[in-house]
């Protein structure tokens, strides 16, 4: 037996096929998400600053947690995660071997919630799911370029000092790819 919380806003973004619609709204767009990655003197990821437009933060702690999780995914995508599929089949079925960041490898994440309410969104909120993942790889690449002058164009950036500092698993027998550099 749950509780029912009635809202004072009704969102109806659908129109039946063949019915005229005075105002068509295809989607609610996000505002922005930006991140800055700070490396230590050895090139390891020390801290990530993440500022995200969430509309109205109905649950600020949940919003921050969602963004921290997105940063975790983004760092793995940028630095260590890889799942090659030769002939359409995964090279491994072991999660520990695909380079997922472990909690001990997570840097400090400082989240700034920017609240610019969406007038047509539920209670002024916007989405904070996938958008948090978008800027991470570029922020890591920019920080690494500032650190060592190497532009990296292939993900994951396993040749970087940041990736080498991570204690992640590797797929046995997989030869590392050569990085593409300018």
Pin down the residues of each PLM region.
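C-terminal catalytic domains of large/alpha subunits in multi-subunit enzymes
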Residues: 1-182
């Amino acid at each position: 037996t749950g509780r029912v919380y009635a809202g004072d806003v009704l969102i109806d973004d659908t129109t039946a096929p063949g019915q005229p619609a005075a105002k068509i709204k295809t989607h609610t767009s996000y505002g922005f998400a930006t991140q800055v990655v700070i490396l230590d003197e050895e090139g390891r990821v020390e801290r990530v600053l993440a500022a995200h437009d969430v509309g109205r933060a109905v649950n600020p702690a949940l919003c921050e947690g969602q963004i921290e999780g997105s940063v975790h995914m983004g760092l793995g995508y940028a630095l260590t995660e890889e799942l090659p599929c030769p002939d359409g089949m995964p090279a491994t079925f072991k999660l520990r071997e695909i380079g997922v960041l472990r909690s001990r490898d997570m840097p400090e994440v400082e989240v700034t919630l920017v609240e610019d309410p969406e007038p047509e969104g539920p209670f002024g909120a916007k989405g904070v799911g996938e958008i948090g993942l978008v800027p991470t790889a570029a922020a890591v690449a920019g920080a690494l370029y500032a650190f060592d002058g190497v532009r990296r164009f292939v993900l994951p950036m396993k040749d970087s000092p940041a990736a080498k500092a991570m204690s992640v698993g590797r797929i046995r027998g997989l030869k590392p790819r050569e990085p593409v550099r300018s």
